[in-house]
């Protein structure tokens, strides 16, 4: 699996791995790259079955497989220890990495994540699946911003959204791969295992997230033994895109604090 690695800003700089959500594209993190690369060696990638890592995914594809293939790619790149920043599905992959490779994951940042899929989130995906079956890739892509962004933010950026729709349609991961990745997301359940995650965790959520209620992050915070929660009052599901200034400050402060906290505990 292909990874994109930024040059380390200094010798032995900590490594931060960015894991996007269901869309799978590493470019999702573009608003964070410049600030992160000043302090960390940053790893971005298109998830298997998407973008520049094309593949046909098995019907039983799972979050555990997503975690294993990423860890193997990191090891192959010479990376043994890394912090993880995961958004939604990416946060699930991050938790799986922390469970399966505890000696490697130094810190976990969960952005609009959850323990197991919420009834409201499931309902949103049911609607989106119906759109996919009835209207194909175009209907899925055109509906997606409604679940990602606040209405006023979208209304002020109509030309940008049209361009994003065209790009997403041109690079659509394919119906079968999308549904198999979505099914992996829906099957994931960390409610009985989260207390085994020992690395420090920062939880970031947006109170106006239409897709994943912020209560999911509260449940995650209660279940994780070493976690802190930060709530953004605005930004929607893709709060790192819509309000990068606020998000980046939380992310940078969280990474610095948790990495220091971990080193002090060693």
Curated annotation (Swiss-Prot):
**UniProt organism field:** Escherichia coli O111:H- (strain 11128 / EHEC)
Per the entry, what this protein does is: Involved in pyrimidine catabolism. May facilitate the hydrolysis of carbamate, a reaction that can also occur spontaneously.
Q: Which NCBIfam families does this UniProt record tie to the protein?
A: RutD
Q: Which UniProt keywords apply?
A: Hydrolase
Q: Which parts form a coiled-coil structure per UniProt?
A: none
Q: Which family does it belong to?
A: Belongs to the AB hydrolase superfamily. Hydrolase RutD family.
Q: Which InterPro entries match?
A: AB_hydrolase_1, AB_hydrolase_fold, AB_hydrolase_sf, Pyrimidine_utilisation_RutD
Query: Which catalysed reactions does the entry list for this protein?
Result: carbamate + 2 H(+) = NH4(+) + CO2
Protein known as:
Putative carbamate hydrolase RutD
Looking up SUPFAM superfamilies in the UniProt record yields: alpha/beta-Hydrolases
An example GO biological process term is: uracil catabolic process
Q: Which Pfam families match?
A: Abhydrolase_1 (PF00561)
Reported EC number(s) for this entry are 3.5.1.-
Q: Which HAMAP family match?
A: RutD
Key word Hydrolase present:
yes
The answer to whether the entry has keyword Hydrolase is: yes
Q: Which PANTHER family match?
A: MONOACYLGLYCEROL LIPASE (PTHR43798)
Give the GO molecular function terms.
hydrolase activity, acting on carbon-nitrogen (but not peptide) bonds, in linear amides
């Amino acid at each position: 699996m292909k990874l994109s690695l930024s040059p380390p800003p200094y010798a032995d700089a900590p490594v931060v791995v960015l894991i996007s959500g269901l869309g799978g594209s590493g470019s999702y993190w573009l608003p964070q790259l410049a600030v992160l690369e000043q302090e960390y060696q940053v790893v971005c990638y298109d998830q298997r079955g998407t973008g520049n890592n094309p593949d046909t995914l098995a019907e039983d594809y799972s979050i555990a497989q997503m975690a294993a293939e990423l860890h193997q790619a990191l090891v192959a790149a010479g990376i043994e220890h890394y912090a993880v920043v995961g958004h939604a599905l990416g946060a699930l992959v991050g938790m799986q990495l922390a469970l399966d490779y505890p000696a490697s994951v130094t810190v976990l940042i969960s952005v609009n994540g959850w323990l197991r899929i919420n009834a409201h989130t499931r309902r949103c995906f049911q609607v989106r699946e119906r759109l996919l079956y009835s209207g194909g890739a175009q209907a899925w892509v055109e509906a997606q911003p409604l679940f990602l962004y606040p209405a006023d933010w979208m209304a002020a950026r109509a030309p940008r959204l049209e361009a994003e729709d065209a790009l997403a349609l041109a690079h659509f991961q394919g119906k079968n791969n999308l549904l198999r990745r979505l099914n992996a997301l829906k099957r994931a359940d960390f409610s009985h295992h989260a207390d085994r995650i020992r690395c420090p965790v920062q939880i970031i959520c947006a109170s106006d997230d239409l897709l994943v209620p912020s209560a999911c992050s509260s449940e995650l915070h209660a279940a994780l033994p070493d976690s802190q929660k930060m709530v953004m009052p605005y930004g929607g599901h893709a709060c790192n895109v819509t309000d990068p200034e606020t998000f980046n400050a939380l992310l940078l402060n969280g990474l610095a604090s948790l990495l220091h906290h971990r080193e002090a505990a060693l």
